[in-house]
A protein has these predicted regions:
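Basic nucleic-acid-binding interfaces
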Residues: 1-77
């Protein structure tokens, strides 16, 4: 698994339809599903730093993306 930075994760969230709803100590990103369910994840402001692996996997679960889906979003032009 390649390492992913906070900046890259943020870009993938934007491409997946998430929107920034709050930015204080951490950024809060949300996406409302057609069922009305809201997915939410918080990101650190540490743009260029790599996301630690356990935290990365927890964040993927929160946004319901697989590693392959995230990498595909990052490869989009």
């Amino acid at each position: 698994m390649p390492t992913v930075t906070y900046r890259e994760f943020r870009l993938a969230l934007q491409r997946a339809g998430f929107r920034l709803v709050r930015s204080r100590k951490h950024e809060t990103w949300e996406k409302t599903l057609p069922t009305g369910e809201i997915l939410q994840v918080r990101l650190s402001h540490q743009m260029g730093r790599d996301i630690p692996t356990p935290l990365f996997h927890a964040m993927l679960r929160q946004v319901r993306l697989s590693q392959a889906e995230l990498l595909a979003l990052l490869r989009q032009a």
